Amino acid sequence: MSYWLCITNRDNWKVVKEKNVWGVPRRHENTMKRVKPGDKLVFYVKQESRKGEVLEPMIVGIFEVVSEPYSDSTKIFKSHTPGETYPIRVKIRPIKIGEVKFKPLIPKLSFIKNKKKWSGHLMGKAMREIPEEDYKLIESLL
């Protein structure tokens, strides 16, 4: 079993929860091909500004993968890139939903090597594998 940190925004987090599906752009297909049924997905929502308010980055849920990756271009996710549908998808089921602030976790997460420039470990990625010890820490706090 593998553990993955899935990086999204609040709009698409709502879609994930409602539809029990996770999707990534085609350029991340090689990463998604490594995802297997039984793997755990930890969802991270990025820091965002909404109406002048800064919404902190958070861990918001853990899901289990229940399908092999598949392709579906049905537009369910929001994207800033015209025509992007996040077509490489897996079906998932919820394990835990909650909110844990991400910044206080940074010193404790082993996959983040550079604690000062931590966002570099997440930028440009849709998802990344994380060690079991980091998964267990996050799960215990959610």
Curated annotation (Swiss-Prot):
InterPro entries (UniProt xref): EVE_domain, PUA-like_sf, UPF0310
UniProt-listed CDD domains: EVE-like
Protein name per the record: UPF0310 protein PYRAB08750
Coiled coil ranges: none
Family label: Belongs to the UPF0310 family.
Taxonomic lineage of the native organism: Archaea, Methanobacteriati, Methanobacteriota, Thermococci, Thermococcales
